[in-house]
A protein has these predicted regions:
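Amphipathic/hydrophobic helical signal segments and adjacent flexible N-terminal regions
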Residues: 1-50, 57-59, 65-74, 80, ...
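Short glycine/serine/proline-enriched coil/turn segments at secondary-structure junctions
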Residues: 32-33, 85-87, 111
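Small side chains
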Residues: 51, 92-96, 105
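An anionic, turn-rich surface loop/hairpin at beta-sheet edges
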Residues: 74-95
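Short, exposed beta-strand-loop hairpins at the edges of beta-sheets
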Residues: 104-112
Length: 122
């Protein structure tokens, strides 16, 4: 097989590791009560590079890509959405690394807060 075919197969395999719903079990910036305020906090990575998330009153739609960070499967995403509490439009970016059964990473709100997070696949 050529390098490009192998790379494509490897990339597809990494995407499948993240596809699905991940329950947010910890965030550095906010307590779990806030994370689960409206719904249990989550990230959902779908097919075709799309996805969504919610924690507290913050909701967003994501564009994600599988990658590798320090030799570990990882995912990077940009997002747009809003704060349902006051209607503020929000955008941001983030990333996560697969550490065993958990996804650990950081979500950034452009010109605002950021938080480390840990999530487990449901």
């Amino acid at each position: 097989m050529t390098k490009s075919v192998l790379a494509k197969k490897e990339k597809t395999k990494r995407k499948n590791e993240f596809q699905g719903r991940w329950r947010i079990i910890w965030m550095a910036q906010w307590d779990q009560e806030y994370v689960d305020e409206e719904v249990e906090g989550y990230f959902k990575f779908g097919t075709g590079g799309n996805g969504d998330f919610q924690f507290g009153y913050v909701q967003g739609s994501m564009d994600h890509r599988a990658t590798v960070r320090e030799g570990k499967p990882a995912i990077e995403f940009s997002w747009e959405g809003g704060d349902a509490a006051d209607g503020t439009p929000l955008t941001g970016r983030g990333w996560g690394v697969l550490e065993g059964e958990e996804l650990t990473g950081i979500i950034h709100i452009h010109l605002g807060d950021e938080s480390e997070f840990t999530a487990r696949k449901e």
